[in-house]
Amino acid sequence: MHQQNGDRSCANEAIGGAHYGPVLVYMSKVADASTADGSTPFFKVFQDTWAKNSGGGGGSDDYWGTKDLNKNCGKMDVKIPTNLAPGDYLLRAEAIALHAAGSANGAQFYITCYQITVTGSGSSSPAGVSFPGAYKATDPGIQINIYQNLASYVAPGPAVIAGGTEAVAGSAGSAVTATGGAPVATATATTMRTSAVVTSAAAVPTNGGGSGACSVTRCFRTYLQGRR
């Protein structure tokens, strides 16, 4: 994920302009990723959200997933849970910028979608949430003043599924440092094959938070009020 298409240079911020907030990844099981329309339920497999910086001032000095994204030159290591059933999936990766989120509709959503095929011996088919509908503009992790002294942060959306990953924001090295839920052992390791990646992009204004769903016809970044 990078604000400049195809750019992975550390000389350029992946998300600039103090766009601090969480990085979340969802997946959705579909019959055929090449024709899926994004209406199937999505479950969360990864999140890198917030951690307190004891030496900082307000929440903007704290550790955030988007800061890790910048530190890693726009790349985030995300492990596909090994317990997932094989087949086609849509993958929704999003960064939520909270620098203007002190009032409703101030958060900004940057979303990328992929079509992937998972292979392996897993059997889990987690329940999910729908987009639009999973977020509200007034959710505590979406409408928040990050410039105050934060004691905690509530990540938007559902919990990470068993076998997914909850990263520790601000950790040295790879952003992936902690496992969310209880991983389920499988006899054969799960692998991922990217079957199709949508390359077109457009800014889609919304007013309800997370109203953009993954679709094979578009790969977009969406903003609550259509602005950066």
Predicted features by range, described:
Residues 89-93:
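A short tyrosine-centered beta-strand micro-motif
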